[in-house]
A protein has these predicted regions:
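Bacterial signal peptide processing site
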Residues: 24-27
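Short, well-ordered beta-strand elements
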Residues: 33-45, 63-69, 136-137
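Short, polar/charged alpha-helical segment
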Residues: 44-68, 75, 79
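Beta->alpha turn/N-cap motifs
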Residues: 45, 72-73, 83, 87-97, ...
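Short helix-initiation/N-cap motifs at beta->coil->alpha
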Residues: 68-78, 165-193
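Ligand-binding "clamshell"
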Residues: 98-110, 125, 197, 202, ...
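A conserved helix-loop-strand patch within extracytoplasmic ligand-binding domains
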Residues: 110-160, 258
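A bilobed periplasmic-binding-protein/Venus flytrap-type ligand-binding module shared by bacterial periplasmic
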Residues: 117-128, 230-242
Length: 273
């Protein structure tokens, strides 16, 4: 074999060896930081505020959360179901069950966090005794929240329902309406904005707080603290056991969060843990 060919082959062998050694010495790519970030859908008040409160502590414990704020109840669950967002924190079990049934989704409750007592509000009246004949009452238009609103009126003697314990009662289930109330079914987020256009409105506390209403002071009627309508952290079957989700659930139910809720919301948001 010619010396030139021997030298050339030796050079190629050395080059290949260098490449192999370089590859062996290379560190594997670090996992994306996105794996340490949990996205959470929430309504602005109180849910996003509670999440902002625990965010620094979670970050110190190695978990970043990205809070996505919504002003309706449909998109948060839709985004979670379609895996654009990891979990949601804004809804009650009756709402979740109705959503799953109507939309064919399989979202699951992970942890109960707090109760927001629903209230009856008016810009015109000072008490239930002042409700005039034929008054117009605006109520939420989603099935579970409408049922909850009607139960509030029923339990306070304003109307009578066919089944006084049915959380999914609708207007057709009213069997007694001595005041001849007229009901307007509206999207929940719009109720504070129509308060001056109707006699009364039954408003979810998160929307009431966002509109600067104080449920414990401004509501003519309010659910008591034994309300079963707990707001839950909600996820999917494929992430309910994710360590990040469990860490978030634990962070939402600490003594510090309880104290924060009690001090900031003065009874309008009641810890459920």
């Amino acid at each position: 074999m010619e010396p030139f060919m021997v030298a050339r082959r030796a050079l190629v062998a050395l080059s290949l060896a260098a490449v192999a050694l370089s590859a062996c010495g290379q560190k594997p790519a670090a996992p994306s930081s996105a794996s340490d970030t949990l996205t959470v859908a929430a309504t602005a008040i109180p849910h996003a505020e509670v999440l902002e409160f625990i965010k620094p502590k979670l970050a110190a414990d190695g978990l970043k959360i990205e809070i996505k704020v919504f002003n309706d109840y449909v998109q948060p669950n839709t985004q979670v179901a379609e895996k654009h967002i990891d979990v949601s924190y804004f809804e009650t079990l009756p709402y979740l069950e109705t959503f799953n049934k109507d939309k064919g989704t399989h979202l699951v409750p992970i942890k109960g966090v707090h109760i927001e007592p629903m209230g009856l509000y008016s810009a015109k009246l000072k008490s239930v005794a002042e409700i005039p004949q034929g008054a117009t009452v605006a109520i939420p238009n989603d099935a579970s929240t409408e049922g909850r609103a009607l139960l509030l009126l029923s339990r306070n003697g304003v109307i009578t329902l066919k089944d006084a314990a049915d959380a999914l009662s609708s207007l057709k289930d009213i069997v007694g309406n001595p005041k001849g109330l007229k009901f307007k079914e509206l999207e929940g987020a719009t109720l504070p904005r129509v308060l001056n256009q109707v006699d009364l409105a039954i408003i979810n506390t998160n929307y009431a707080l966002d509109a600067k209403l104080n449920p414990t002071k401004d509501a003519l009627l309010i659910e008591d603290s034994k309300s079963p309508y707990v707001n839950y952290l909600v996820g999917r079957l494929d992430n309910k056991d994710d360590p990040r989700v469990k860490k978030l659930a634990a962070a939402l139910t600490t003594p510090e969060v309880r104290a924060f809720m009690q001090q900031k919301y003065e009874g309008a948001v009641v810890p459920a843990f």
